[in-house]
Amino acid sequence: RTGRCEASLSGHTDSVESVCWGGVGFIYSASRDRTIKVWGAEDDTDRGEGRTVGKLVRTLSGHGHRVNALALSCEYVCRTGPFEHSGAHFASAEEAQQAALVRYNKTGGGTEAEVERLVSGSDDFTLFLWSPTTQKQPISRMAGHQQLVNDIAFSPDGRFIASASFDKKVKLWDGRTGTFIATLTGHVSAVYKVAWSMDSRLLVSASKDSTIKLWDVSDPKTAKHTLPGHADEVYALDWSPNGAQVASGSKDRTIKIWRN
């Protein structure tokens, strides 16, 4: 609460484009120097792990151009809950707890899902999938976009990755292996942003073409809805915690709220 700087992390040789807190005591950074760096975010020296705040743990290399974006799979752990997309209410706390447990088990809870996975997107048109706390080599190199990658997002359940690109496309990938799943086409200009619904069923994308598109990942061939309304490029998107609404922000200086 003092506002003091706790640590200054130096090591990148060009500007830092993205930072991401991990869930197991690390912080990740992406840079124009084409690397991702893994830093200690907790002081574990008293436990004999040799990790201190700000200490460089490892450098992840492989991209051929600047790294624009990072996304971390462990985010879903904070969001797992008794969500019901139909809007139905649970009769009791016990029923809600059981629904949450079912959703958690579907993610592979208690097994490999506990290992953080990091995905990076670059100006070299590729994405890399990493296990950043355990190895320097990527799990997968994900190629397919024809222009630079603007944004990436893990689905809350960790099963999917969505990527947005200047090539006007959104692509879906397997969140554990990096295997390509589908290309979502429909935007007529660069796609800037993607965001998942809390139950991982739906995806929204925002574009330079001034529209937002809503996709159902079970049938991604065509957009479920196109949401016109902004008068200029759409830069920002987010779902409400209850999954019922989407907020968007545009170059037209407005924020719009859409109901699912």
Question: Could you describe each region identified by the protein language model?
Answer:
Residues 1, 19, 36-41, 49, ...:
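WD40-repeat beta-propellers
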Residues 5-7, 25-28, 57-58, 77-81, ...:
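Structural hallmark of WD40 beta-propellers
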Residues 29-33, 121-124, 156, 163-167, ...:
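Conserved strand-to-loop turn within each blade of WD40 beta-propeller repeats
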Residues 72-112:
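Structural signature of eukaryotic scaffold interfaces centered on beta-propeller domains
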